[in-house]
A protein has these predicted regions:
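Short, small-residue-biased leader/transition segments that mark boundaries at the very start
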Residues: 2-3
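Helix N-cap at the beta1-alpha1 junction of Rossmann-like dinucleotide-binding domains, i.e.
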Residues: 158-159
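N-terminal Rossmann-fold NAD(P) dinucleotide-binding loop
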Residues: 137-138
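Glycine/serine-rich phosphate-binding loop and adjoining beta1-alpha1 elements at the start
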Residues: 36-127
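Glycine-rich Rossmann-fold phosphate-binding loop(s) that bind the pyrophosphate
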Residues: 132-134
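Short beta-strand element of Class I
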Residues: 150-152
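Rossmann-like adenosine-cofactor binding region
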Residues: 166-214
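An anion/phosphate-binding loop that grips the pyrophosphate of nucleotide cofactors and donors
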Residues: 24-25, 189
Length: 214
């Protein structure tokens, strides 16, 4: 934790309330999306710089439009190579955590089937299916292959799959999404990771309840 003294020693002023900050600032820099009470504090032409994820937050979107503030979403900021440098670190953490959390949920005490994702002598490893070969997918594959799971990665881009093959070698099985029957692979999967990204929009719904037996 950073104390108020550390901020003050660096030259910052400590405001008593969030309202004071919104009233006195031309730019608001946050990490999480604004709460409803914060949206009401925004004013016309005030700049808000934070993660927003508006595609899944219609009420927040309406509130920001009504405020007439200038909103810049970290997750849509691109660099000169059309990459998402502010989203990438969050995606890397999400990808790595997904395998860790998924492996935990497969344990019997958590209501899982009692599967050791990396297998054991005389026991086959678990099947991991990763949808999307971007930052989330690559980092999920890093952990899954490290745990010695059987890993399939699905992506639309053959070029991206070749890059992943260069990195992981025969530790992954690359699959071009247009050439496979996703339903068949899902049926054989122990751990399914969704990592498909459309910048600024909701991710496509690739998996139905029917596919996973719900």
């Amino acid at each position: 934790m950073c104390s108020s003294d550390l901020y003050q020693n660096a030259g910052a002023s400590i405001a008593p309330t969030a309202g004071d900050i919104f009233n006195d600032s031309d730019m608001i820099v946050k990490v999480k999306e604004p709460q409803s009470e914060e949206v009401s504090m925004l004013r016309e032409n005030q700049i808000l710089f934070t993660y927003l994820h508006l595609s899944a937050a219609s009420e927040l979107t309406k509130g920001l439009v009504k405020s007439k503030s200038i909103c810049i979403a970290y997750e849509t900021v691109t660099d000169q190579n059309n990459r998402l440098p502010l989203l990438a670190p969050m995606s890397a953490v999400a990808g790595r955590m997904s395998i860790q959390a998924g492996a935990h949920c497969l344990e019997k005490p958590q209501g899982g089937r009692g599967l050791l994702i990396g297998g054991a002598p005389g026991v086959n490893p678990g099947n991991v299916l990763i949808l999307g070969g971007g930052v989330v997918g690559e980092n999920a594959a890093t952990i899954a292959t490290g745990m010695e799971a059987k890993v399939h990665i699905v992506d639309k881009s053959e070029a991206r799959l070749k890059e992943l093959e260069m990195k992981f070698g025969d530790r992954i099985i690359p699959l071009v999404s247009d050439e496979i029957n996703l339903k068949d692979y899902v049926a054989e999967t122990d751990l399914l990771i969704g990592g498909v990204l459309i910048p600024g929009a909701n991710a496509p719904k690739l998996i139905s309840k029917e596919m996973i037996g719900i």
